[in-house]
Amino acid sequence: SGRILTGDGLRKNEIGYLPQQTVVQKDFPAAVREIVLSGCLGRCGSRPFYNKEEKKLAVDAMEKMQITQLARRCYRELSGGQQQRVLLARALCATQKMLLLDEPVSGLDPKVTAEMYTLIEKLNREDGITVIMISHDVAAAVRYASHILHIGDTVFFGTRADYLQSPQGRLFDVKKGGDSQ
């Protein structure tokens, strides 16, 4: 347990979460629009319906994730990459401050993986959303992250440049594709 030393921290409704996909999630029988809108539930309080602002937020999130054309489709009929975009759009409805992503590209093919990383990078650089990502993809972490927390036999936290000079980072050769411990 720690203490917040500066500022007031973030409230739970200021953090969007993208969980690692499970078999149960992949077969969820709801329309894309409904799933994206569900990211607004924290804003509704005791109100049973979404308001215009929340509906617009969902439309905007679907546009950012380039899934507007899928709004009426059933989630379980989508490809893995499309499903991840839907879940990321849902997380965007929850917050514009911080996203916590748990293995966001797990199980995706290389082309879709690259597209997802590009979308995530754009959210960070253009929209100013802080992204904390859990990943076993060390190459992507080195390529996209400003800071890296490496937890293995030893722990490292610091900038990308410092990581590459650290004992943990030197075990991973980015130019060769590498392999992390």
List where the protein language model places each region.
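Helix N-cap at the start of a conserved alpha-helix in ABC-type nucleotide-binding domains
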Residues: 110-112
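H-loop (His-switch) and adjacent beta-strand-loop-beta switch element
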Residues: 147-160
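H-loop/switch region of ABC-family ATPase nucleotide-binding domains
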Residues: 135-136
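Catalytic Walker B motif of ABC-type/P-loop ATPase nucleotide-binding domains
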Residues: 99-102
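Conserved ABC ATPase "signature" region
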Residues: 37, 52-70
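Short loop immediately C-terminal to the Walker-B catalytic DE motif
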Residues: 105-106
